[in-house]
């Protein structure tokens, strides 16, 4: 499937699916991530007049801001977006539904349906001492600034810190994307800190494998309990607590238990 898709894209002869006759019904899609784009494509095939509203300045949602170029090149995403445009899907960027325009205004403009695909963009923090220190970022902010705002450039208006020692808390795919990005930005020592064992990591096996091949260190069965900042307020140290695994929790994985 990957070979066929790449061949079609590189040949420039991309097929557009059959579109039913336009029915004149306007549908609004809030968000241009995977769910929004998939829904837009399906509705367009059935003849609906679809408009996708994106809050950011790039169409693609998490496909653009959350997944690094080395894992999903933007040009691949852009081809899919171009296909949707050829199918008749309209795209409006820099538009926040509820602020730039209201749902009531969409209804006044004739939209008969609204599909909310805004994603789960709010990060979860641990609420531990020192968490507000300078250079502590959520993966969401870090990847967005690097992937979408060119924050790795010295001329960027929103530069990210180029830490020589970088710790990423968590063991999912987003954690792997973050730590591998840090390595590419020059981190001499990049480490995953995870409260369970490697077997319980939710990240895909191949993502863990690639991270190890790139020199990422893994410290499992440890969890941060405090961050220490220097006199300028920049994080310089993290205090960890050792963890052991107890009985399985609701996720089916063994629950982390702090060792006194």
Segments (PLM) and residue ranges:
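N-terminal Rossmann-like FAD-binding beta1-loop-alpha1 element of flavoenzymes
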Residues: 25-52, 174-183
